[in-house]
């Protein structure tokens, strides 16, 4: 990623602001697969009761402490499942993101993938980690599907959309679906002041 960042800087048009440096996870096989300026988005349209906020806070605390098995047990409890499927799915996606950072791609995919397809509109970042885990484990079609879904979700920052669109193009190319590459590259390139947008414009 540092080399790609330097390349992006060297090819940056004069009047454009420099792209933000990508933030990389601690362990990754593909260095470009860091956060890359992804902005965490709110859970649009989903209601949070006091109980829901408290339980999600417990999940976040367990995830931060890397107690992922405990977090998975918590969301299986009746009091959590009573919140509804979307809340359970958001918790699963959050747990899956930590499995990804720990290098457990299979666990990340199994935890986050179905949850992202069901409830990714509330937590688009779930598609990001499910997509990266899929890509890193060689499931390129699955990766492309997740990145496409994230890129198509409205209300995100230009950083998030350009990153998802760029990786959708990349995953489709590796998955030998060249007919699906140009659309996503164009979408990424429509945000030229972002890291991935600038890369897309040079491809």
Predicted regions and their residues:
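Solenoidal tandem-repeat scaffolds enriched in leucines and small polar residues
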Residues: 33-90, 94-95, 107
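Solenoid-like repeat scaffolds
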Residues: 1, 12-14, 25-32, 41-48, ...
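Generic helix N-cap/helix-start motif at coil->alpha-helix transitions
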Residues: 2-3, 15, 47-57, 83-94, ...
């Amino acid at each position: 990623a540092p080399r790609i960042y330097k390349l992006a800087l060297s090819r940056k048009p004069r009047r454009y602001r420099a792209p933000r440096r990508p933030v990389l996870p601690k362990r990754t096989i593909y260095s470009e697969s860091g956060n890359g300026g992804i902005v965490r988005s709110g859970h649009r349209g989903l209601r949070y009761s006091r109980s829901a906020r408290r339980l999600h806070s417990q999940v976040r605390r367990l995830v931060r402490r890397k107690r992922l098995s405990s977090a998975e047990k918590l969301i299986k409890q009746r009091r959590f499942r009573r919140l509804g499927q979307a809340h359970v799915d958001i918790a699963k996606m959050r747990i899956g993101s930590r499995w990804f950072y720990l290098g457990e791609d299979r666990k990340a995919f199994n935890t986050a993938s179905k949850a992202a397809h069901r409830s990714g509109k509330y937590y688009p970042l779930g598609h990001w980690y499910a997509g990266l885990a899929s890509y890193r484990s060689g499931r390129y079609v699955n990766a492309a599907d997740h990145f496409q879904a994230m890129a198509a979700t409205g209300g995100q920052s230009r950083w998030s959309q350009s990153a998802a669109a760029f990786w959708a193009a990349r995953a489709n190319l590796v998955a030998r679906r060249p007919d699906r590459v140009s659309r996503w590259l164009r979408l990424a390139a429509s945000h030229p002041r972002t890291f991935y947008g600038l890369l897309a414009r040079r491809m």
